[in-house]
């Protein structure tokens, strides 16, 4: 069954939380009004007022924003009824610390934090497996796009000898 159909067949929406409310999360928020079965429970950010402005600038109305729990601390929201945490700080140290706390609390985590993934991804995957939860990369972040390209190449019969992102090496 396709993912959208599975989502639509749920009785209750998936409750999510964001850690970090910058560019990536703002892009998600811009689509949020069109997502029926996803509910933002919480947003953790060091600058709550800026996070609220990002929500507003992304098209969320004041009623929707008022229903979101904003916090400066992940610890304050770990016991809430949240199914999936999206770690989007872009900081490898904080991202890893956040992911470990989430995983050890038996919650799923999506990393929009390539920095944490490249430094500690294997470790996070191992402890997620031990705790019976999923630690995944976000579609659209560099590692998941590279994996998609590798899978496409292999499905089309190509042998992949190297894969990566070289855009930052090109001077335009």
Regions found by a protein language model. Give the residues of each.
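N-terminal Rossmann-like dinucleotide-binding module
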Residues: 1-58
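Short, ordered loop/turn segments at secondary-structure junctions
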Residues: 46, 90, 114-117, 140-141, ...
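A structured beta-alpha segment of the ubiquitous adenosine-cofactor-binding alpha/beta core
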Residues: 62-93
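Rossmann-fold NAD(P)-binding glycine/threonine-rich loop
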Residues: 96, 101, 114-133
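A short hydrophobic/small-residue beta-strand
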Residues: 108-110
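Rossmann-fold dehydrogenase core element
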Residues: 124-140, 156-162
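Oxidoreductase and adenylate-handling cofactor-binding alpha/beta cores
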Residues: 145-159
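Conserved small/polar residues in nucleotide/adenosyl-binding loops
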Residues: 170-172
């Amino acid at each position: 069954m396709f993912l959208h159909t599975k989502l639509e067949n749920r009785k209750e929406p998936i409750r999510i939380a964001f850690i970090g409310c910058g560019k990536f999360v703002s892009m998600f928020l811009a689509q949020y009004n069109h997502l029926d079965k996803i509910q933002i429970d919480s947003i953790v950010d060091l600058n709550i007022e800026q996070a609220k402005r990002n929500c507003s600038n992304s098209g969320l109305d004041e009623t929707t924003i008022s229903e979101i729990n904003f916090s400066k601390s992940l610890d304050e929201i770990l016991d809430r009824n949240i199914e999936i945490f999206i770690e989007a700080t872009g900081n490898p140290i904080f991202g890893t610390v956040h992911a470990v706390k989430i995983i050890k609390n038996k919650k799923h985590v999506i990393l929009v934090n390539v920095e944490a993934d490249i430094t500690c991804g294997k470790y996070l995957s191992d402890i997620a497996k031990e705790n019976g939860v999923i630690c995944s990369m976000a579609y659209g972040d560099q590692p998941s796009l590279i994996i998609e390209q590798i899978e496409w190449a292999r499905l089309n019969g190509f042998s992949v000898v190297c894969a990566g992102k070289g855009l930052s090496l090109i001077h335009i």
